[in-house]
Structures are given as C-alpha cells and as structure tokens.
UniProtKB/Swiss-Prot annotation:
HAMAP family: HemL_aminotrans_3. The keyword Cytoplasm applies. It comes from the Bacteria. This is Glutamate-1-semialdehyde 2,1-aminomutase. Its cofactor is pyridoxal 5'-phosphate. GO terms for biological process: protoporphyrinogen IX biosynthetic process. The gene is hemL. The keyword Isomerase applies. Its EC number is 5.4.3.8. It catalyses: (S)-4-amino-5-oxopentanoate = 5-aminolevulinate. One of its GO terms (cellular component) is cytoplasm. It is found in: Cytoplasm.
C-alpha cells in the first residue's frame, strides 16, 4: 500500500482530513483510506494494483457497476458535443419524462446537482406551499448537510432540535422536530402536539445511514395518514433508495405515495446529480412560475443526463431489478450462513439491492438504538479482514452496502469465500 500511503500523506496537507467527504477517511474503522484508480464491472483496483470486489458502488450510484461500456459510450458521445451550456437541453427533458414515468409521486421534477440540494430545496418548497415552518425528521436518518436537518434529538422521545454540529445556529434547527425512526407511537404523539404547525415530514423510507433498516409494517402508512390529517406534506428522501430498492423506488415497493420525492445517486449514473419532484400544484410554486426560489448553474448538465438515462435504462429493463435483488439475497444469505457456521452473532437486513450487516444477536434490527448497540469492534475487524481478502465494504458500521448488476457468480462466490476466511479471524 505504498502509493496509497504516499497519496494520503499528500492529501492531508492539502485537503481537510485528506478527504473530500468524511466517511472516506476510515475514521470509523481505523487505518488509512485506500486510493483507487480504476473500476470495471464489480471490481475496483487501488493505486498499488490490488483488486477488490466492490460493495460500496460509489455509495450507491453505480447500480450498473463500474465503467459499463454503454454508459461510458453515451457519456463520451455527449461530452464531445459540449460539457455544459447553461441553457435548457433536450436530455434534461428526457430525464424529467423518464423520472415521471417511473416514480409514482412525480408529476413534475426539478433537476439539481446533489442530494443535499434536493432535500434543501424540497424543504423550502414545502414551507412555501404550506405556510408553516416546522419539519419532522427521524433519528438515524441523513438528508445531506442541510443546516436545518443537521439536528439531533435531546433527551426523551420527542424534542425540539438541537444543533448536531458546530456552525449550525440553534435558531436554524429550532423548528426541526426529531422523532425515533420506526416508532409509530412517537409519530402520533408528535402530530398530536404540533400537527397544525408542521410543514412536512422528511424520511428515508429505508434508512440507509444507520446501516440498512427497512420500515416496520405500518410506519410509512402512519406517516401518510398523519400528513393527510393535518395537511402537512410527506417527503420521501429517496436519494439512496431511488431505483435501489425497486424500479419504482421505495414508494413503489411499499405502496405509499409521498407528496414530494428527493432523488440522486443512481439518477446520475456516477455523475453529480440531484432531483426533487411531486404533485404539479406543489412544484409550480417554484420560480419562475411561483415564488419559491431555487437555481443552479450546472443543473440538468447534459453529460450527467446522458450517464443517468443510460443507467436508468439498464435498471428499469424487464427482469433487471429482479435479477439484481436475487443476487443481493445470495450475497446477504451467504454471509449470514458463514457467520452462523463460525459462531459469530450477525443480523442482516435487505431492501432490494441494499443490505446491512449488524454484529448483534438482537434481531431483527429495526431501531437506531439497536444499531448503536451493535459490536462495532467486531465490524471493524471484519471490515479489515475482508479488505485483506480483496472485498471492499463500506468503511463504517452505519453505512449500507450495495450490489450492482455487474456482480456475477464469480464475484459473489469470491465474496463468500472471503467472508468464510474473514469470520475465522474475527
């Protein structure tokens, strides 16, 4: 790992922490982050030439795998015509049409450049539409680095938000209510106390930033019911789950239609992207047709649109997602079987092509408190053992894993063989 070490030393002199996103730093698992230079299919190669089976997939976007030939061809073809124009382009219309065709809640959509932009803009729009200020979010859910959503809960099941990091003023999060995820009773209590003041509820329909925790039966239904009852808007943050848990996203999988949806990751096929959309009457409140302002220099970038459209064609093709979900199940069940054989307590969750590994015997894992109580040291040992074996998992116990269409039988078997050896070392 000589070249990786050298690059990280250089990076730490020039970039805070040596990384451009904190989770990449390996702070949660220990050691130094690995620098990668190439990917193909389900594999990545680091700068020292070692190959890994990849279950991070760029934190979700690469549902077709690395350097898919058709996606690369479409990107190259589009880039040759110009990287950006700052004007409307045909590809953004095609992307908007594609999203509205596949995502049940979308009648109109606005394209942006990141998931954070999508959630930030959706909140502003919800407040503008309802004329209310309070936002409900859930413990363990992450919605980007939006000040109003970097709130943490205080003591008790239901509290007003307090800042979750330095630099976030108390006044900014004062209108943020934080409720335990998957706690139906707490949701009811929240709306009984504050329902007439709540502009919106924002939720990851499958929590992917407390590892991978699907909704318990009745949870999403309760959110829809209380929002309908109080005229609050329901916002699904599907930046991670969009086209990852089903070809119609989480809302199609679970049969609950939100008022607004935030998207990202897969929609850009590996390029920077975000999107938010919903009912026409709400979306027409955005400038220039309405008074809620939102803008972006590179929004609807043609190269991003090309990559995203090519990716969406792959994942929405007949039978594609079903095959991907079956592959994911083979990976998850295979790892669980090998943990059981080694006498290692391991709980697993899966939602489509997302999965979670929890070093605990407290199953099923449905609550953030359970996630925090897992054996983090065991996860860290397993992570490094798998890394040694050539399998790249998310370098944090609180992050979901991802499988791609490119993960074939060889990649799966290589992973399971590595897991068997790794559990012997844990």
């Amino acid at each position: 790992m000589q070249r990786t070490h050298q690059l990280f030393q250089q990076a730490r002199e020039l970039i805070p922490g040596g990384v451009n996103s904190p989770v990449r730093a390996f702070k949660g698992v220990g050691g130094e982050p690995i620098f990668f230079e190439r990917g193909e299919g389900p594999y990545m190669w680091d700068v020292d030439g070692k190959r890994y089976v990849d279950y991070v997939c760029s934190w979700g976007p690469l549902v077709a795998g690395h350097a898919d030939p058709e996606i690369v061809r479409r990107v190259q073809e589009t880039a040759a015509k110009g990287l950006s124009f700052g004007t409307p382009v045909e590809l953004e219309v095609e992307m908007a049409r594609t999203l509205c065709q596949h995502v049940p809640s979308l009648e109109m959509v606005r394209l942006v450049n990141s998931g954070t932009e999508a959630t930030m803009s959706a909140l502003r729009l919800a407040r503008g539409f309802t004329g209310r200020d309070k936002i409900v979010k859930f413990q363990g859910n992450y919605h980007g680095h939006v000040d109003a959503l970097l709130a943490q809960a205080g003591s008790g099941a239901l509290t007003l938000g307090v800042p979750g990091c330095p630099g976030v003023p108390e006044a900014v999060v004062a209108e943020t209510l934080t409720v335990p995820y998957n706690d139906i009773e707490a949701v009811e209590q929240c709306f009984n106390e504050h329902g007439s003041e709540i502009a919106a509820v924002i939720v990851e329909p499958v929590a992917g930033n407390m590892n991978c925790v699907p909704p318990v039966p009745g949870f999403l239904e309760k959110l829809r019911e209380v929002c309908d009852r109080t005229d609050a808007l329901l916002i699904f943050d599907e930046v991670m789950t969009g086209f990852r848990v089903g070809p119609q996203c989480a809302q199609g999988r679970y049969g609950i239609t939100p008022d607004l949806t935030c998207l990202g990751k897969v929609v850009g096929g590996g390029m920077p992207v975000g999107a938010f959309g919903g009912r026409r009457e709400i979306m027409e409140g955005l400038a220039p047709t309405g008074g809620v302002y939102q803008a972006g220099t590179l929004s609807g970038n043609p190269v991003t649109m090309a990559a995203g459209l090519a990716t969406l064609e792959r994942i929405t093709a007949p039978g594609a997602f079903e095959g991907l979900e079956q592959t994911t199940t083979r990976v998850v069940d295979g790892i669980k079987e090998r943990a059981d054989a080694a006498g290692i307590p391991l709980a697993t969750n899966q939602a489509g092509s997302m999965f979670g590994l929890f070093f605990t015997d407290d199953a099923p894992v449905t609550r953030f408190e359970q996630v925090k109580a897992c054996d983090l040291d065991a996860f860290n040992r397993f992570f490094h053992a798998m890394l040694d074996e050539g399998v790249y998992l998310a370098p944090a116990a609180f992050e979901a894993g991802f499988v791609s269409l490119a993960h074939d039988d060889n990649a799966v078997q290589e992973t399971l063989d590595a897991a068997e050896r790794a559990f012997a070392r844990v």
